[in-house]
Amino acid sequence: MSAPERRDPQDAVFAPEELLRALPTPCYVYDEAQLRTRAARLRSAFSWSAGFRAWFPVRALPNPTVLRILREEGQGALCVTAGEYRLALASGFSPGSIRFAPEFPTDAELAVPAADLVLDDGGLLLRLERERPLPARLGLRLRPEPDRSFHKAEATRFGMRTGELLDTAQELRLKGVREVGLSAMLGLGLRDPEAFSALARALFTCAAALHDSFGLQVSYCCLGGGLPVAHRRTERDADIMAVSHGVQAEFSRIMEPAGLGGVPVETGLGRWLTAHAGILLTTVTGVKRGAQDWLGVDASRADLLRPELYGTYHHISVLGDDRVEGRRRYAVGDRIPEPREPFGQRLLPECRRGARLIIHDVGAYGASMGYSYGLTPHCAEYLYQADGTLRCIRRAQREDELFSTLDENPDFTAPAETPSGQAESQRPSEG
């Protein structure tokens, strides 16, 4: 079952209202049909590339059920920690469908027996040799020279400059490695398709140099991620077809004349793939009137960190109430006493306690970035399945689980004390 692409995805509520009203809040809800539709669009856009492979960054949405869906849609798992690698294996990915690309890895992470390993720094080579035999194929991450299309590339920490990468490749060849892959990760939310054309140009030029100068076989060229999605109603997603066409033009101009026309082009998109497929459902717990009207909700910054950390905008709507007239500007806050509102200010229909709000486009780097500030347990996650039913795919964390690793573990079985000091269980019954 598939769903048509939403032209205004941040306004879409994919699950029926009655199902959402029955859920305990706060919770995340993901749309299976949207996940599959986006994966299919990506495959279609790059169908011109023989052997095209899309790699999903596990850190964007590390839920085994979602990972299984993406695996069924042909995605590979892109992992940056040993924990992500272990989760990918447990989610059914074969070792050949897992790419391990740690940055500043620990010795234990370098020892992970990944069949597809990417080095971010040439200096890692000696450390890698101490931990494990060199594989027959290694990936190298390029940090391209700043281009007018991605002028902030100078500040990115990902990868090696061309000279360092070529030196590392030559050293690999001397050590018996005959096959290398190339990848890049700008991670800047580049909306202009020309930025990806410029990135492809840098990757393909480097690939041709590896092939011509060192006789190395180039096994792939991965463009990484960074393709943005629309969060405001006035925006539209980056045009994946325009991005693909620009990359294809550079491929035809550089790779085919170099005899590299069979090298697969790859992507590592996270937000573009899953952001629209997730919402955070929350309930209004209180309303404050004043110079600034406030809505308190049961979700907190511990459930969704991105707006406070990065200043990202996420559309908010009221479940079952799309009135335009009589809207008020509310600051949407939580129960953790910090000066800034965690979810921003929004024009919303007048709300009362008990109203349900939907925070949109949180299917990437939403739940995965949750933390326990304020001793807030992680909320539950649900999947709206293609057959129209809801399934719990992660239960809410229990409060006692927050303390499970402490040396002195609090006793949550003890009766709570009343303000008078009398144990709750010993209070006389009324009447």
Positions of predicted regions on the chain:
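A charged N-terminal "starter" segment
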Residues: 1-135, 174, 178, 212, ...
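Charged (often Lys/Glu-rich) extended helix/loop segments that serve as interaction or gating elements
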Residues: 260-431
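Flexible loop/turn segments at secondary-structure boundaries
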Residues: 62-65, 86, 147-148, 188-192, ...
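Conserved, mostly hydrophobic/aromatic
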Residues: 35, 59, 81, 113, ...
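Active-site loop/helix belt of alpha/beta enzymes
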Residues: 134, 144-285, 374
